[in-house]
């Protein structure tokens, strides 16, 4: 199933600290964080990248005009981490076989690391593929279409890691 359609969803909806500039605009080696992460995502997936904005959408969206990404505005971002995940999944085309979820704050994640996740997933598009962490698995992670209902069922403070950390679930680890 090498031709399975994968979409990268970059999560950037939360507000960050009150009375502070948007964290998405923080500079990493002189480059604003959000465009940096979107550049890494598009290097792997081309135009198959969506970004979910929320709290600072009006401020951040104009800076994304030239990037080949789909903008999703989550009007329910204040609910917690679950809302932008749902907004991103709801925006996907029916032909989408899987979604790679990446939080925009993960500036340590490179395009090469994202590509490794994708390469492993393409060998078995029914598998969840994720980065290992102390608590089990974390983002970035690829969720096959069969996991979309679980992502859409998340509420409030529940993040997608909840699906990765279910007892007995098989997740392929890609360090």
Role assignments for model-derived ranges:
Residues 20-23, 28-32, 55, 72-83, ...:
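Residues at secondary-structure transition points
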Residues 9-13, 102-103, 131-134, 174-175:
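Short beta-strand segments
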């Amino acid at each position: 199933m090498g031709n399975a359609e994968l979409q990268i969803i970059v999560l950037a909806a939360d507000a960050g600290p009150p009375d502070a500039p948007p964290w998405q605009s923080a500079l990493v080696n002189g480059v604003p964080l959000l465009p940096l992460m979107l550049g890494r995502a598009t290097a792997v997936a081309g135009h198959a990248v969506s970004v979910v904005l929320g709290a600072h959408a009006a401020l951040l969206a104009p800076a994304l005009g030239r990037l080949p990404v789909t903008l999703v505005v989550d009007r329910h971002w204040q609910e917690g981490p679950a809302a932008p995940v749902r907004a991103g999944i709801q925006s996907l085309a029916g032909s989408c076989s899987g979604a790679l979820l990446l939080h925009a704050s993960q500036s340590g994640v490179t395009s090469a690391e994202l590509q490794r996740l994708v390469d492993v997933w393409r060998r078995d598009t029914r598998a969840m593929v994720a980065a290992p962490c102390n608590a089990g698995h974390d983002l970035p992670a690829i969720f096959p279409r069969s996991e979309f209902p679980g992502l859409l069922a998340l509420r409030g403070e529940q993040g997608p890691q909840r699906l990765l950390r279910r007892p007995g679930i098989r997740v392929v680890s890609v360090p």
